[in-house]
Amino acid sequence: MPQQTQTQVETSTSSSSLSQTQTEQQSGPSPPQDQQVQGVLRLRPDSATDTKNKNKSKKKKPKVRWTEDVVDNEHMNKKKTKICCIFHPQRSFDDEMAEHNHEHDHGHCDSSDSDSSSDLSSDESEEENGNKLPSNGRGSDKDKLYKPNSYEYQPHYENKSRVQL
């Protein structure tokens, strides 16, 4: 009895796929069941699919590039944008004296007339400038400017990092 062998060949192109079936007739005795030849299926990716997968795996994440004037965090090669410690730059004695004199020469008087309309308008203008007054109810404290301590003050940094795509 002739044996029929069926072979299936698939051809794939980038726009469509083609399937072809071939049937062969063989005459002669068939090999026993344990000696039948088994085919090996080898799958190969389409060249267009292969390049897409390579591009996805090699896609670079954006990296931050620091400029030369960014300060190293405590000399440990860790340049960070977070606030980790408070830095007070050293000043010369002349600068400290000039600032000290400036703080006490604002023209404020120590009068107890804190309920007048002129004091109210000066308080509003000080709050607009970012200097908030303490609200503890004492009249003499209203004449002093409130300065936040180092932990309350948020510095205004200029973004010096560069993102490389």
Swiss-Prot record:
Any one Pfam family match given in the protein's UniProt record, by short name: PPI_Ypi1
Q: Where is the composition biased (Low complexity)?
A: 1-40
Gene Ontology CC annotation, any one:
nucleus
Chain intervals with Basic and acidic residues compositional bias: 43-53, 65-76, 96-111, 155-165
Keywords per UniProt: Nucleus
Q: List, alphabetically, the InterPro entries matched.
A: PPI_Ypi1
Single GO term (MF): protein phosphatase activator activity
Q: Does the keyword Nucleotidyltransferase apply?
A: no
Q: Where in the cell is it found?
A: Nucleus
Where in this protein does the record put region Disordered?
1-81, 96-165
GO BP, sorted A to Z: glycogen metabolic process; intracellular monoatomic ion homeostasis; mitotic spindle assembly checkpoint signaling; regulation of protein localization to nucleus
Q: Which family is this protein grouped under? A: Belongs to the YPI1 family.
This molecule's function is given as: Regulator of type 1 phosphatases which maintains protein phosphatase activity under strict control.
Name the chain's protein. Answer: Type 1 phosphatases regulator YPI1
Give the originating organism.
Answer: Lodderomyces elongisporus (strain ATCC 11503 / CBS 2605 / JCM 1781 / NBRC 1676 / NRRL YB-4239)
